[in-house]
Amino acid sequence: MYSVEQSFVEWLAVKGYAASTYPPATGSEFVTVERTGGEVADLIDHPTVAIQTWAQTPMRAEEMALSIRNALFTSRPQGIANIAVNGLYPFWDESTRLPRYQLLLNCTAQLTD
């Protein structure tokens, strides 16, 4: 079964980012992927996806987010037909005290097995 989160995690790994659907216990620089909503109709999935970049400095977290955003304009994760970047903004994490940036994406994917 197709997973939009897994597709983004695999794509980010190819781009050189340590990515997961949850933050690791340790690490100073990583990326998380989370489906935050969206609708499904007639075997077409329209997920809203949040990609969060975490780093030691706000500048590096933003740099990572911008790099990922720019890469999305030239290649897409498997199964994703269309991506619109809906937002890019700082999103501090109070629990880890690490700087974090978030990309909010609206996507279109075909549901297939």
Where are these regions (language model features)?
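Charged, amphipathic alpha-helical segments and their flanking helix caps
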Residues: 1-17, 28, 34-113
